[in-house]
Amino acid sequence: MYNFVTLSILGAYLHTITLILLAAGSSSRFELDIKKQWLRVGDRPLWHFVADRCEKTGYFDKIIITSSLDDIEFMKNYADYTFVEGGQTRQQSLKNSLLHVDTEYVLVSDVARSCIDEAFLKKIISHVGKSDAVVPYLNITDTIVYDDKTIDRERVKRVQTPQLSLTTALKSALLREEEFTDESSAIVANGGSREFILGQESAHKITHIEDLKKLSCLSAPSSDTLSGVGFDVHAFDDKGEMFLGGIKIDSEYGFLAHSDGDVAIHALIDALLGAAGMGDIGMMFPDNDVKYKGADSKELLGTLVTKLRHFGFVIVNVDITIAAEKPRIGNYKMAMRKKISSILGIDAQRVNIKATTTEKLGFIGRGEGVGVIANANLKYFDWTKI
């Protein structure tokens, strides 16, 4: 015999459902450099952990994830979902996503509700077809006071996501000019109906750092060290100044390059990108883009460091080998270490600079330019130690 929920789920398969996961928020209330959607659960970022759990239920015909364009470029390395650029508000992100929805129903949730499990999804979906929106909620157990008056807490609900909506009803509701904080409120304001069902505490939303302690479904990030190697060369130019390792070098030459030609910083950028799995310097700072003409390589490195933190990486150490017949850099090593460490946000002892020659071999040996090999090690930010 099938029970009611099983029969309801079997009936739900007669309907098509798209899952929208909203991940375009700035995490401004999270108070860390890392965006919460990039916290790691094992080796996976939080958004992928949530999407994968939902996908494995088999309930959804399509999965859409909203985020910023920068995030989307990196997200594509993890999974083949439909990614949509988010808007300035949650509602605008939802509108953008709905342009890609052609299923009868849509389930909308926030990636920050990371402990949504199959049982909870099954419960929500089992109510498909009963109203324009299915809304999970939690009861209030504390006394509620508004404007110095005590409110009957039996009349107050803590509304959660995910919420299941009839797609046509939600699209119509969002044509209104008002801003709504959840889907069902928009649908009801537009004359639609909603059904409340009891939610679950484990669907708590990560908003503040302390919320992480409430989520038992999340395992710690992997402790693996991620390593990358970068290599770059630049020929000398008899015009301009020489910048190497983030500092100005006393030399009769500069470097022939699109930017300021700091070959050591360029190799380091590639090493960091390699460790993070984020491509290469040509992808992030293309040399055919006029905005990088004459660019200060220190600023490019600083931009990358911000991105690495944003995506949940911590720089462990870097090691840079400079191969050159000239200039002699022995007296510049400490200044390079201090400058690079200040940009990376790590202690100077974690930045190593080595110099070598090529024993007069090749273009470096002929004094035509400089080559650099850089190594970088990263780890995932460990949010369990906050």
Curated annotation (Swiss-Prot):
Keywords: Isoprene biosynthesis, Lyase, Metal-binding, Multifunctional enzyme, Nucleotidyltransferase, Transferase
Binding site for a divalent metal cation: D232, H234, H266
Residues with site note (Positions MEP for the nucleophilic attack): R153, K205
InterPro entries: IspD/F, IspD/TarI, ISPD_synthase_CS, MECDP_synthase, MECDP_synthase_CS, MECDP_synthase_sf, Nucleotide-diphossugar_trans
Residue positions binding 4-CDP-2-C-methyl-D-erythritol 2-phosphate: 232-234, 258-259, 280-282, 285-289, 356-359, 363, 366
Gene3D superfamilies in UniProt: 2-C-methyl-D-erythritol 2,4-cyclodiphosphate synthase, Spore Coat Polysaccharide Biosynthesis Protein SpsA, Chain A
Site entry (Transition state stabilizer), positions: R29, K36, H258, T357
Gene Ontology biological-process annotations: isopentenyl diphosphate biosynthetic process, methylerythritol 4-phosphate pathway; terpenoid biosynthetic process
Family: In the N-terminal section; belongs to the IspD/TarI cytidylyltransferase family. IspD subfamily. In the C-terminal section; belongs to the IspF family.
Functional summary from the UniProt entry: Bifunctional enzyme that catalyzes the formation of 4-diphosphocytidyl-2-C-methyl-D-erythritol from CTP and 2-C-methyl-D-erythritol 4-phosphate (MEP) (IspD), and catalyzes the conversion of 4-diphosphocytidyl-2-C-methyl-D-erythritol 2-phosphate (CDP-ME2P) to 2-C-methyl-D-erythritol 2,4-cyclodiphosphate (ME-CPP) with a corresponding release of cytidine 5-monophosphate (CMP) (IspF).
Name of the featured protein: Bifunctional enzyme IspD/IspF
